[in-house]
Amino acid sequence: MKDNSLKPVSFIRSRCLRLRHASSRCTKCLDVCPSDALILAEGQVGFLAHKCIGCESCIAVCPQDCYLSNGISDKGLEEEIRRKTSGKTLKISCQRIERQQENVVVNCLQRIDVSHLAQASRYGVETIELHTGKCSECQACRNASWLDEKKIEADEFFELFGNKLTVSREEHEWNVDYSKRHFLTNLLKRGELGEQKEYGE
């Protein structure tokens, strides 16, 4: 059985703008965190690792690189994009769906930011296909408009550099292991399984 659990990110607090500059009001990571793993206490960002679900949305928005993936690193993701770019189309998949070998795989597609769009464009990519699970039912997707934001980023990139990028989405079923985990977790949240542990633990 494959392990579909996602590892928490690592937080390097010393890099945070709020710590380095008393006047900073940055809330980018707080705004996108879907699990309340990030809190604001006395003007500083706090990280509750036990609440982190590993979606890595914070990595995509933090301007100071405060968050590090415990899955694929930024450098590793860049290498995957380089290696799996074929022709004019790049396919990127959510980890929780069945995917093809040629796809770049990330924990959550909200991890993809404008720098990845720029990298793909440099390799001649004109279309980026985002292969998702059922985002509307996923705990990681607090931001329901994330796809629209990616399309806006692509349009802004075009305006800056003149390279047209089309961002499209295909929705898939979750893979079998994750579907079971998700179903039983929801039962636990409703108290229907008492003290039983989540599937797969």
Sequence positions of predicted segments:
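Non-ligating segments of multi-cofactor redox enzymes
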Residues: 1-27, 83-201
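Aromatic-flanked redox-active Cys/Sec active sites in thiol-based oxidoreductases
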Residues: 13, 35, 49
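Short, solvent-exposed loop/turn positions at domain surfaces
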Residues: 20, 46-49
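Iron-sulfur cluster-binding cysteine motifs and their immediate structural context
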Residues: 24-46, 57-74
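Short microdomains enriched in Cys/His and/or Lys/Arg
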Residues: 32, 48-63, 75-93
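Basic (Lys/Arg-enriched) interaction patch that binds polyanionic ligands
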Residues: 45, 52-61, 178-187
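Repeat-unit-sized solenoid/scaffold elements
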Residues: 68-79, 196-200
